[in-house]
Design a protein with these regions (language model features):
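Conserved HGGG/HGGXW glycine-rich cap/lid loop of the alpha/beta-hydrolase fold
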Residues: 2-50, 64
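Conserved alpha/beta-hydrolase "acid-adjacent" motif
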Residues: 186-192
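Flexible "cap/lid" loop of the alpha/beta hydrolase fold
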Residues: 44, 76-77, 81-120
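Catalytic histidine-centered segment of alpha/beta-hydrolase-like enzymes
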Residues: 211-224
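Catalytic histidine neighborhood in serine/cysteine hydrolases
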Residues: 194-213
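Short beta-strand/loop motif that positions the catalytic acidic residue
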Residues: 173, 179-181, 185
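Gly/Ala-rich beta-loop-alpha elbow adjacent to hydrolase catalytic centers
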Residues: 63-67, 71
Length: 233
């Protein structure tokens, strides 16, 4: 019997392991789970290198939003080590100037001790409209922001602004791929997911009904099921 495949989870911007809290107990039944540290560097290449330095020799990789951007960079650096990849609520495209300008404005607020204000600005776009006043969900976002902190947030935004366009390398991804998106994701809309899936041979595209950008927390059962099916395929 082969050894269980380790699973590495990369959270999104201003997010921690709590982003995957509903999935982690179920994923452990498939293989050992680790949460990547994406808070200490301000370049995508350095973030990917740091994760790869401590990751198992071969593993399944899951990234949501910024985690997906990092996953693309890891696939550039060490494709032979990634046995499977799941790209959730993310995009293969680089920032456009308007996005970078928004990030710089948020970084300024964060540097002034106004990170909570940044989160309040973002929340309406992060979740499905029906969940915008969900107190429990808002509390999870607030706790994650506290865990990451302003300095790491600024490093993360710097890395995101400097990331490469990954569309040209989609065809080089040979491992089993899951591409998943919430049907109401405003930040990385379903069209971005379809673009990724179309570029990766054999990729499975899953759209989660009633979810915005943070599908793991908004529709946890559906996302868990999709991940388990991907791991077993």
């Amino acid at each position: 019997m082969s050894e269980p495949l380790p699973i590495v989870l990369i959270p999104g911007l201003l997010a921690s392991a709590r982003m995957y809290a509903p999935q982690i107990p179920h994923l452990w039944r498939a293989g050992p789970v680790t949460i990547a540290d994406h808070t200490r560097d301000d370049r995508m290449s350095a973030i990917a290198q740091r994760i790869l330095a401590t990751a198992p020799e071969r593993f399944a990789l899951v990234g949501l939003s910024m985690g997906g951007y990092i996953a693309f960079e890891m696939l550039r650096q060490a494709p032979q080590r990634i046995a499977r990849v799941a790209l959730l609520d993310t995009s293969a495209r680089a920032d456009v100037p308007e996005q970078s300008a928004m990030r710089r404005a948020q970084m300024t607020l964060a540097s002034q001790g106004r990170l909570r204000e940044v989160l309040e600005q973002q929340l309406p776009r992060l979740v499905h409209p029906a969940r915008r006043n969900d107190t429990a969900l808002r509390e999870v976002f607030a706790l994650m922001a506290q865990e990451v902190g302003a300095e790491a947030f600024i490093r993360q935004q710097t890395a995101i602004m400097g990331r490469s366009d990954s569309r040209e390398m989609l065809g080089s991804i040979r491992c089993p791929a899951l591409v998943l998106v919430g049907d109401a994701d405003e930040l990385t809309p379903p069209g971005r997911a379809a673009e990724i899936a179309a570029g990766i041979a054999g990729a499975r595209l899953v759209t989660i009904a009633g979810s915005g950008h943070v599908s793991t927390l908004e529709r946890p059962d559906e996302v868990t099921q999709a991940l388990l099916e991907w791991l077993q395929a």
